[in-house]
Amino acid sequence: MSWQAYVDDHLMCDIEGHEGHRLTAAAIVGHDGSVWAQSATFPQFKPEEMNGIMTDFNEPGHLAPTGLHLGGTKYMVIQGEAGAVIRGKKGSGGITIKKTGQALVCGIYEEPVTPGQCNMVVERLEDYLLEQGL
């Protein structure tokens, strides 16, 4: 299966039990900032934005004072799991980023999708990739 198929079939799919509800954008990005696959709607990000995200995984709390920036959009960093997940909120939407051994799994949502639904979609793929040694 191609990386694009993982994004299309596992991240941009309908939310279980909520037909028609899906993430706004999603991507799988290498730790070096290289895009492995992304939805057509995933924002073009700057290298320094990805560097900030990777720094926060290695030094939890790094993004809290300034917020998480992705594609020029600023998200307020909310609770996460140090070194494992970063969550951000902006208005009625937000972002979840999970880290595997080699990649970041990113999901962006807007209402009616809830933060919990976004977390579930992103974490399900992240768990699978971890099981595969990725």
Swiss-Prot record:
SMART domains: PROF. Keywords: Actin-binding, Allergen, Cytoplasm, Cytoskeleton, Disulfide bond, Phosphoprotein. Phosphorylated by MAP kinases. The modification Phosphothreonine is found at residue 114. Disulfide bonds join 13-118. It is found in: Cytoplasm, Cytoskeleton. A motif (Involved in PIP2 interaction) lies at residues 84-100. The variability of the residues taking part of IgE-binding epitopes might be responsible of the difference in cross-reactivity among olive pollen cultivars, and between distantly related pollen species, leading to a variable range of allergy reactions among atopic patients. This is Profilin-1.
